[in-house]
Amino acid sequence: MGNNIKVTFDPNKLAAWWPTVGTYYTPTTTVTNPAIFKPGIYQTTSLKNPKNQQELDAILMTRYKEIDWDNWQGFPVNQRLPVSNNNPPSGQRAETFEIKSRPIIVPGIRDIPRGIVPPQTPSNRDQRRKPTPLTPPLRDTHPHLTMKNQTGHLQGFAEGLRALTTSDHHNSAYGDPFTTLSPVVPTVSTTLSPPLTIGDPVLSTEMSPSGLLGLLAGLQVVYFLWTKILTIAQSLDWWWTSLSFPGGIPECTGQNLQFQTCKHLPTSCPPTCNGFRWMYLRRFIIYLLVLLLFLTFLLVLLDWKGLLPVCPMMPATETTVNCRQCTISAQDTFTTPYCCCLKPTAGNCTCWPIPSSWALGSYLWEWALARFSWLSLLVPLLQWLGGISLTVWLLLIWMIWFWGPVLMSILPPFIPIFALFFLIWAYI
């Protein structure tokens, strides 16, 4: 007795799969009114009957390779196979197989039935024998996975296999007098794996030349900016130190007597000098001031663009509407014009618009006027300075002319920062 191999199938479409299963022994005599196979357990006595799962795989693979895929037109789904009632040929021992489905991995195909065998006339064998143990799990790797130039034909093969699947369940089955296994429930798995594309390029984990050049360029930019930052800090440190020495910066007087160092300025103390910690303390303060200056510039830029919706403390104009109509607030939207609303107990809302530009500056100015009333005296002066722009420009030119030589030794390191600020101001 061979191993039990179970399969489930649609009886109405059984013949569609039959031509690709393998060569089985089929008697020449059939019944007058041929009937289609029904799910169950049958006998077969083919010369190529598989004795185990490996032999069945070999039969399926042989049949798969015998098919002329170039001229294959699909399965004859309207074909019906007759039920055979003849006895086995002489010298051949009848083998009983319980037909069972197992997945066979084909590119684009999954969960297809392994094979079908024609029924034979039952013999008087023992009814109470124990069932044959199940076969071990089948490996998912098959030789036909390495076949080439079959992608187009396998698509038609998958379409033919889809004709075998059905969502209906048939409960009728033929019994087997030689085994105690239950009849097979006719359910077919319709799950098809996605097509496997053959010849796709393998993704390489190595960096491409363009990516390597981009990385090197990025490192160069970072190194350039870091050197400029150090140069700016050194220039500001020199300017800060020069404020304490109007006649010129002398040599460093904080040299350590234990570790003699060469003569140097206080702005370039080596680590062995006592002035080294004071030099880096000054530069740390300089870095904080530069960061504060940058954040202030960014805040002014955002306020000028109107991206900081702040409700004014003393609105120039206001309206009173029903609270149900007052639904827009500074926290709910970022599109101009803005609307600030208050909800009094009477059920009406007092609303006023937020300035489309300099909203934060207006709020800070109003806050300062509320606490320092003398600042209101500066309003006419500021308006006057704004009205005489020519005078202001002349004053600025005179200041640059007077402090020009000193500024020219300080400003060159700041030129990249000024260019960056200009680009941010122009494009934001």
From Swiss-Prot:
**Pfam family of the protein (one):** vMSA
Q: Which residues lie on this side of the membrane: Virion surface?
A: 2-211, 305-376, 427-428
Which GO biological process categories is it annotated with?
caveolin-mediated endocytosis of virus by host cell; fusion of virus membrane with host endosome membrane; virion attachment to host cell
Q: Which InterPro entries match?
A: HBV_HBSAG
All ranges on the Intravirion side of the membrane = 2-283, 233-283, 398-403
Q: Name one GO cellular component term.
A: membrane
Question: Which residues bear N-myristoyl glycine-type lipidation?
Answer: 2
Membrane-spanning residues: 212-232, 284-304, 377-397, 404-426
Q: Where is this region: Pre-S1?
A: 2-145
Which residues are reported to be glycosylated? 348
- Give the subcellular location: Virion membrane
Query: Region (Disordered) spans which residues?
Result: 110-144
Show the segment(s) annotated as Pre-S2. Answer: 146-204
Pre-S: annotated segments: 2-204
User: What keywords is this UniProt entry annotated with?
Assistant: Acetylation, Caveolin-mediated endocytosis of virus by host, Fusion of virus membrane with host endosomal membrane, Fusion of virus membrane with host membrane, Glycoprotein, Host-virus interaction, Lipoprotein, Membrane, Myristate, Transmembrane, Transmembrane helix, Viral attachment to host cell, Viral penetration into host cytoplasm, Virion, Virus endocytosis by host, Virus entry into host cell
Q: Which HAMAP family match?
A: HBV_HBSAG (MF_04075)
Q: What does this protein do?
A: The large envelope protein exists in two topological conformations, one which is termed 'external' or Le-HBsAg and the other 'internal' or Li-HBsAg. In its external conformation the protein attaches the virus to cell receptors and thereby initiating infection. This interaction determines the species specificity and liver tropism. This attachment induces virion internalization predominantly through caveolin-mediated endocytosis. The large envelope protein also assures fusion between virion membrane and endosomal membrane. The middle envelope protein plays an important role in the budding of the virion. It is involved in the induction of budding in a nucleocapsid independent way. In this process the majority of envelope proteins bud to form subviral lipoprotein particles of 22 nm of diameter that do not contain a nucleocapsid.
Domain writeup: The large envelope protein is synthesized with the pre-S region at the cytosolic side of the endoplasmic reticulum and, hence will be within the virion after budding. Therefore the pre-S region is not N-glycosylated. Later a post-translational translocation of N-terminal pre-S and TM1 domains occur in about 50% of proteins at the virion surface. These molecules change their topology by an unknown mechanism, resulting in exposure of pre-S region at virion surface.
- Full protein name: Large envelope protein
Organism expressing this protein natively: Ground squirrel hepatitis virus (strain 27) (GSHV)
